[in-house]
Amino acid sequence: SIRYGNLDILEDGYGINMLPLATYAMETYKDDPCTVFGIKGVSDYHSLEQELGRKMHKAIAVIQFKVEGQIIKRHPGYKMDDRILLEAVDYNRGVVTIEGTEYPMLDTMFPTIDPKHPLRLTKEEDELLHTLIMSFRHSGLLHKHIRFLYTNGALYKCHNGNLLYHGCIPMRPDGSFEGMICNGEELTGRALMDYIGEQIHKAYFLSEDDPDKNSARDFMWYLWCGAKSPVFGKDKMTTFEHYFVADKTTHRERLNPYYKLSQQEEVCDRILQEFGLSGEGSHIINGHVPVKIKDGEMPVKANGKLFVIDGGLSKAY
């Protein structure tokens, strides 16, 4: 929300108090212009508002990278150690090593990072995070909307012979379904989607004292940015690189092979069969896939088997 200037949604819409973050950011980064943390798509902010926004943006981003690193450490099975980039920084020299190559960093001011323990939250960061968590947990309207999504939504839906889903069905380059190890068993296709659906519900509905709840919550984070997540569909999320590295080759996020393969009718038929659907009247309705109309791309693909719904209503697109 901060990155795209949408704090009004949190503050006015859901009643979540951003003052603790603003106060912390102004104090912690008072001598830091935070220039690489500009607010996207916002031109009507007063200069002081933009400065505060940049400081808040950096403050929560640093906390994000620390907490994400901790999640990855807890789950070696995610195979995301290469994304713990705070540990790949040489804080004395101001460089970060990514996939074996050193890059100079665009920002080297990290007053809250201990180079010996870069993932450790400071006392102030920990208190701020706890305060923000409590604000989110006690927002009645937010939970009303979340419950609506859980009641009416699903990871996929079969309806009138059609298959609807968001993102992709993870695939390998040879067209076979990409697997994920879940509780010691490799799951693919529909079995993987069903398992993910179960974890999504556990993350919200299990009681706070159930040890499976925290694991499911961590898995929800993996779904947002993990390489084998059907709702992400890329090899990595390069947020860190966008902030700190000028070399745009590090910004690239490679799409899952699904996105090319699904343009073939026979691949779509195989996906439909995986979900118990077949015949001329069956189609895939695929959400969250931008359609580049200006480049001549069409939303109907695979000889009419695949309908792609663009994310064009988003300001970011």
Model regions and ranges:
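Feature recognizes metal-dependent phosphohydrolase scaffolds
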Residues: 1-317
